[in-house]
Curated annotation (Swiss-Prot):
Organism encoding this protein: Mycobacterium tuberculosis (strain ATCC 25177 / H37Ra)
Protein name per its UniProtKB record: NADH-quinone oxidoreductase subunit B
GO terms assigned for molecular function: 4 iron, 4 sulfur cluster binding; iron ion binding; NADH dehydrogenase (ubiquinone) activity; NADH:ubiquinone reductase (non-electrogenic) activity; quinone binding
Free-text function comment from the UniProt entry: NDH-1 shuttles electrons from NADH, via FMN and iron-sulfur (Fe-S) centers, to quinones in the respiratory chain. The immediate electron acceptor for the enzyme in this species is believed to be a menaquinone. Couples the redox reaction to proton translocation (for every two electrons transferred, four hydrogen ions are translocated across the cytoplasmic membrane), and thus conserves the redox energy in a proton gradient.
Binding positions ([4Fe-4S] cluster): 37-38, 103, 132
Keyword list, A-Z: 4Fe-4S, Cell membrane, Iron, Iron-sulfur, Membrane, Metal-binding, NAD, Quinone, Translocase, Transport
Known cofactor(s): [4Fe-4S] cluster
InterPro entries per the UniProt record, alphabetical: NADH_UbQ_OxRdtase-like_20kDa, NADH_UQ_OxRdtase_20Kd_su
A single GO cellular-component term on record: plasma membrane
Any GO BP: electron transport coupled proton transport
Length: 184
């Protein structure tokens, strides 16, 4: 006989983290950060056919101070990397990053000195979305996966510790331009 059976009807038991996660996942405001071809598919996702507003993303925010999700859509050049980091630092907590497309995830076909070989070398990434370019349906699926991740995310000091560990791992990772393998 649990506590739920002893309580009168109409009482809901939950934790603060679950309630906060539910509210956060349904009110994301993405920042506009389209860098290449993937940005076209990201814009199509906001159109009437796919209607990203169904998932709480009523509008794309033009200022990082009002955004809590950065969708990096496309390749990131070495000159754009500091700007990307500055925009990420200006976003208020809690914030999440989605790497959209192969170029944002791993540099894509641009394996040279001018392109960052994965945006995770600049900012911590929460969700990687493969494809060249990924379809709007795939972006919606990635957003739903991010919703699941947000709902399970801890609050307070536990979240700060998780963010610090992710950023430390990103900074210590060896750049893929320096890796040697079958193609180099």
């Amino acid at each position: 006989m649990g506590l739920e059976e002893q309580l009168p009807g109409g009482i809901l038991l939950s934790t603060v983290e679950k309630v906060a996660g539910y509210v956060r996942k349904n009110s994301l405001w993405p920042a506009t950060f389209g860098l290449a071809c993937c940005a076209i598919e990201m814009m199509a996702t906001a159109g009437p056919r796919f209607d990203i507003a169904r998932f709480g993303m009523e509008r794309f925010s033009a200022t990082p101070r009002q955004a809590d999700l950065m969708i990096v859509a496309g390749r990131v050049s070495q000159k754009m990397a500091p700007v990307l980091r500055q925009i990420y630092d200006q976003m208020a907590e809690p914030k999440w990053v989605l790497a959209m497309g192969v170029c944002a995830s791993s540099g894509g076909m641009f394996n040279n000195y001018a392109i960052v070989q994965g945006v995770d070398h600049v900012v911590p990434v929460d969700i990687y979305l493969p494809g060249c370019p990924p379809r709007p349906e795939m972006l919606l699926h990635a957003i739903l996966k991010l919703h699941e991740k947000i709902q399970q995310m801890p609050l307070g000091i536990n979240r700060e510790r998780a963010i610090a560990e992710a950023e430390e791992a990103a900074l210590l990772a060896r750049p893929t331009i320096e890796m040697r393998g079958l193609l180099r």
